[in-house]
Swiss-Prot record:
F(1)F(0) ATP synthase produces ATP from ADP in the presence of a proton or sodium gradient. F-type ATPases consist of two structural domains, F(1) containing the extramembraneous catalytic core and F(0) containing the membrane proton channel, linked together by a central stalk and a peripheral stalk. During catalysis, ATP synthesis in the catalytic domain of F(1) is coupled via a rotary mechanism of the central stalk subunits to proton translocation. This protein is part of the stalk that links CF(0) to CF(1). It either transmits conformational changes from CF(0) to CF(1) or is implicated in proton conduction. Belongs to the ATPase delta chain family. It comes from the Bacteria. It is a peripheral membrane protein. It is found in: Cell inner membrane. Its main location: membrane. Keywords: ATP synthesis, Cell inner membrane, Cell membrane, CF(1), Hydrogen ion transport, Ion transport, Membrane, Transport. Pfam families: OSCP. This is ATP synthase subunit delta. F-type ATPases have 2 components, F(1) - the catalytic core - and F(0) - the membrane proton channel. F(1) has five subunits: alpha(3), beta(3), gamma(1), delta(1), epsilon(1). F(0) has three main subunits: a(1), b(2) and c(10-14). The alpha and beta chains form an alternating ring which encloses part of the gamma chain. F(1) is attached to F(0) by a central stalk formed by the gamma and epsilon chains, while a peripheral stalk is formed by the delta and b chains. The keyword Cell cycle does not apply. HAMAP family: ATP_synth_delta_bact. GO terms for molecular function: proton-transporting ATP synthase activity, rotational mechanism.
Amino acid sequence: MAELATVARPYAEALFRVAKAGNLGAWSELVSEMGQIAAVPDMKAVADDPKLSKADVAGIFLSALKSPVSHEAKELVGLLVANKRLTLLPEIAAQFHVLRNASEGAADVEITSAFPLEGAPLTELVATLERKFGKKLQAHVSVDPSLIGGVRVQIGDEVLDTSVRARLTQMQSALTAA
């Protein structure tokens, strides 16, 4: 996994520089879509098919995109196909997203709750987390009933676990240590 990140980083950084010079929002959507399409098993099979020419693989990939494709994006796809690195696009997209967030002072936050969390409670939680971390946060919410109650929040490498399960685990550790 670290190797993929290392190989994808220069592509993501170059792509981000191009995107900053143009329309960052449109590029962000396009790069996300490219990453999603490249992750599809059928597209991986097309990329690895020795019977298809590089131009055919690039053409098939580009035809699967719904977003408008610029000349630079076509060149990127051609370069990745020529170097047999089309399958790097999901990692390139992930790193591009991290670069965009960093430039905008934003971050993704993974919120896991024991019960569905939406509306006003979610808005309040995100606002509190934004004040705590000093960043604009994009929340991704999931439900995990095994938490029993409370929430588990992950922003980058930092984890805040206020779930009942975490508290029970702490209590168990304290009781068995005594």
